[in-house]
């Protein structure tokens, strides 16, 4: 690990949580240089919904490269882009009666967010945007401004103007409908909240702690947008692409976003980001918003193969099947350790297990890694274990991972109890 410590910036993060050198990967497993296998409950922060090195995706990319397929094309027309757009339309958009234009941005999620915010402000002629508590939308200037976590929002490098924050669903508890707060602030001309160009939200706040918005809350927010002529931007970067069992996480709610941002698994494991926008919002002038790496052609090849999964209901049903197992397993963990005051929440194959004891989730994650399981943390104080396995994970592997977590919690709990009863310390 010395070369990384010598040459790589202090900003590195995951390498600190998982301090080994990984050499290869397959399906739901990572392997280090010594050949040790690790079950992956992180999936590249939601980039690897179809697993590591999916055979069908790899074969398509190899064939494309062997045929001297175009790798870099700016936004030129290419056969790879054509095939991707046709598959996206036929497999995702048309079956859902979704009439959207596709804008390719730079290859990361934050590029898509920046484009969406810029477009919304341009179309509406307003500068304000409303975001929500605990939101995470990226770490470039615009996306960071609509991100809630104070850790990222140092005033030295983020412009806090032109963004208003409102409480997300459940922020004050399930009994409080925070969409009423939103409506009241917009109705009151003296609230200090300017009429925004857009409201941006995640249906499930992944980085924010796996906070799940109720369908009725999402519909209420959409109604506010319609009543006040505000654009609704839904960030599907981490929780879309089938993560909840349907391709879009908002489908069950029945809402119709004006703008949708996609990245991570939309590229089949490769860098790709795009914005879906209603046709009447496509008011860009040619070349008004560009990027050297918009439209990654090799990612188009991978993405086309990944989208084929959604030509039938098989993968969605598999996610539903494993979701029930995951939910049941987490509820069993909560019951097995009542003294910890844990709680579980989520949908599909994104779940969070909150461990309120300060620092314990981090200790459990580290213990899991020693036992051969990669799992990351979420929430403002890193108190949530975030379950984000590949959608294609086998049931046996999922259950094995849950077993490792149970062992890890038990070991960490016993260690804390041995240290002067820390389990009863600060929560």
Curated annotation (Swiss-Prot):
Matching entries from InterPro entries are given as: Aminotrans_3, Aminotrans_3_PPA_site, Dat, Ectoine_EctB, PyrdxlP-dep_Trfase, PyrdxlP-dep_Trfase_major, PyrdxlP-dep_Trfase_small
Named in its record, the pathway it takes part in is: Amine and polyamine biosynthesis; ectoine biosynthesis; L-ectoine from L-aspartate 4-semialdehyde: step 1/3
Enzyme category, top tier: transferase
Name the Gene3D superfamilies for this protein: Aspartate Aminotransferase, domain 1 (3.90.1150.10), Type I PLP-dependent aspartate aminotransferase-like (Major domain) (3.40.640.10)
Q: Which GO terms describe its molecular function?
A: diaminobutyrate-2-oxoglutarate transaminase activity; diaminobutyrate-pyruvate transaminase activity; pyridoxal phosphate binding
Q: Which cofactor does it need?
A: pyridoxal 5'-phosphate
Enzyme Commission code: 2.6.1.76
N6-(pyridoxal phosphate)lysine: modified positions:
264
A Gene Ontology biological process annotation?
A: ectoine biosynthetic process
Q: Which UniProt keywords apply?
A: Aminotransferase, Pyridoxal phosphate, Transferase
> According to its UniProt record, which protein family does this protein belong to?
Belongs to the class-III pyridoxal-phosphate-dependent aminotransferase family.
User: What NCBIfam families does the record point to?
Assistant: dat, ectoine_ectB, PRK09264.1
The UniProt entry, under PANTHER family, shows: DIAMINOBUTYRATE--2-OXOGLUTARATE AMINOTRANSFERASE, DIAMINOBUTYRATE--2-OXOGLUTARATE TRANSAMINASE
Quote the protein name from its UniProt record. Diaminobutyrate--2-oxoglutarate transaminase
Taxonomic source organism: Wolinella succinogenes (strain ATCC 29543 / DSM 1740 / CCUG 13145 / JCM 31913 / LMG 7466 / NCTC 11488 / FDC 602W)
């Amino acid at each position: 690990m010395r070369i990384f410590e010598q040459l790589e910036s202090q900003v590195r993060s995951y390498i600190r949580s998982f301090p080994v050198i990984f050499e290869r990967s397959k399906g739901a497993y990572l392997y280090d240089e010594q050949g040790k296998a690790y079950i992956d409950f992180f999936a590249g922060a939601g980039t690897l919904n179809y697993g590591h090195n999916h055979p069908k995706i790899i074969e398509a990319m190899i064939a494309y490269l062997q045929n001297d397929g175009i790798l870099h094309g700016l936004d030129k027309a290419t056969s790879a882009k054509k095939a991707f757009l046709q598959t996206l339309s036929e497999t995702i958009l048309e079956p859902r009666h979704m009439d959207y234009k596709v804008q390719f941005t730079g290859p990361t999620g934050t590029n898509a967010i920046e484009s969406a915010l810029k477009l919304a402000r341009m179309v509406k002629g307003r500068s304000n945007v409303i975001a929500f508590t605990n939101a995470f939308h990226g770490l470039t200037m615009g996306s960071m401004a609509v991100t809630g976590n104070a850790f990222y929002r140092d005033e030295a490098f983020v412009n806090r103007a032109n963004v208003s924050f409102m409480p997300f669903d459940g922020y004050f508890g399930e009994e409080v409908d925070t969409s009423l707060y939103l409506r009241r602030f917009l109705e009151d001309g003296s609230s200090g909240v300017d009429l925004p160009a857009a409201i941006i939200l995640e249906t499930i706040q992944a980085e924010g702690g796996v906070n799940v918005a109720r369908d009725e809350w999402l519909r209420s927010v959409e109604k506010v947008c319609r009543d006040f002529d505000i654009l609704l931007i839904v960030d599907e970067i981490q929780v879309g692409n089938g993560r909840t069992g349907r391709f879009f996480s908002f489908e069950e709610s029945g809402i119709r976003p004006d703008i949708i941002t996609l990245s991570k698994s939309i590229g089949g494991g490769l860098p790709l980001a795009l914005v879906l926008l209603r046709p009447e919002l496509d008011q860009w002038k040619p070349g008004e918003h560009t990027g050297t790496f918009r439209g990654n052609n090799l990612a188009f090849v991978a993405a086309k193969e990944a989208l084929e999964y959604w030509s039938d209901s098989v993968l969605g049903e598999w996610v539903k099947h494993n979701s029930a197992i995951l939910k049941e397993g987490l509820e069993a963990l909560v019951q097995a350790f009542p003294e910890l005051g844990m709680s579980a929440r989520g949908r599909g194959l994104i779940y969070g297990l909150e461990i309120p004891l300060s620092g314990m989730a981090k200790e459990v994650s580290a213990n899991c890694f020693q036992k051969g399981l990669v799992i990351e943390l979420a929430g403002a104080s890193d108190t949530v274990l975030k379950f984000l396995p590949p959608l294609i994970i086998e049931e046996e592997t999922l259950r094995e991972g849950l077993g490792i977590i149970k062992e890890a919690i038990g070991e960490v709990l016993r260690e804390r109890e041995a240290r002067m009863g820390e389990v009863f310390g600060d929560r």
